[in-house]
UniProtKB/Swiss-Prot annotation:
Transmembrane segments: none annotated. The keyword Repeat does not apply. This is Large ribosomal subunit protein bL21. One of its GO terms (biological process) is translation. It holds the Pfam family Ribosomal_L21p. It comes from Phytoplasma australiense. Keywords: Ribonucleoprotein, Ribosomal protein, RNA-binding, rRNA-binding.
């Protein structure tokens, strides 16, 4: 059984026992989180939402809040002595999907 959820402006396919990375959520590690924006549930029978499936939710446990590996943003204009170097680390939350309720 798997479901398609919406979080952080993205759609993710999740199943029970799966670990996922999502945009940072404002909760602490070891707490539980519930996704109510379930777009579809696939199992013995398929349920599609318009736009969401009524009564469906996905429960997850927060493993950790962290920041991704640093990337370098380098802007450059030739012959103009313009160089701008900037780093960025995206914040994310790692979750363990515990239950899909449809």
């Amino acid at each position: 059984m798997f479901a398609i959820i919406r979080t952080g402006g993205k759609q993710l396919r999740v199943s029970e026992g799966q670990e996922i990375f999502v945009e940072k959520l404002p909760i602490n590690p070891e707490q539980n989180y519930e996704f109510k924006e379930v777009l579809a549930v696939y199992g013995e029978k398929s349920i599609l939402g318009q736009p969401y499936v009524e009564g469906a939710k996905v429960q997850a446990q927060v493993i950790k809040n962290d920041r991704a590996k640093k990337i370098i943003v380098f802007k450059y204009k030739r012959r103009k002595k313009y160089r701008c170097k900037q780093g960025h680390r995206q914040a994310y939350t790692k979750l363990l999907i515990t239950k899909i309720i449809a």
